[in-house]
Amino acid sequence: MMSLRSAFALLPLFLFLIVANVESRKDVGEYWKLVMKDQDMPEEIQGLLDASNIKNSKTHAKENKGAIGEFEPCPNASAYGDNEIHANENKGAIGEFETRPNGSAYGDNEIGAEFTDDFEPRPSMTKYNA
């Protein structure tokens, strides 16, 4: 008798999950054109589909415009795997630049650094061992 009560308690949750996903595909017409090689959907089928274009903030992804404006990132020197990078090796490279470098090593100790004039980075050093 107790398992029947718990099943009835979970029933509204499962029904909500099913109903929430009913309108998962809004652009059925676009899918039809893609599959049918740019042929229009027949009028007989169009009447069967609900093609409302009402935007729901929960179902449509918001566009991320990225970073706008100036910001100061925190660069780091990172080493992954069996890289042998010591603090003594990096001191010479740091002294040669006006801005502090962002050096990263991946795989076979290939160290690359990219700089942008607008940034004033703060140094940090991270090493990940395998």
UniProtKB/Swiss-Prot annotation:
Coiled coil stretches, renumbered: none
Mapped Sequence repeat ranges: 60-85, 86-111
UniProt keyword terms in alphabetical order: Repeat
InterPro entries: Organ_specific_prot
Sequence segments annotated as region (Disordered): 79-130
Signal peptide, first to last residue: none
Presence of keyword Transport: no
NADP in keyword set: no
Residue span of region 2 X 26 AA tandem repeats: 60-111
Entry comment describing in which tissues the protein is expressed: Expressed in pods.
Family: To organ specific protein S2.
Protein name, entry field: Organ-specific protein P4
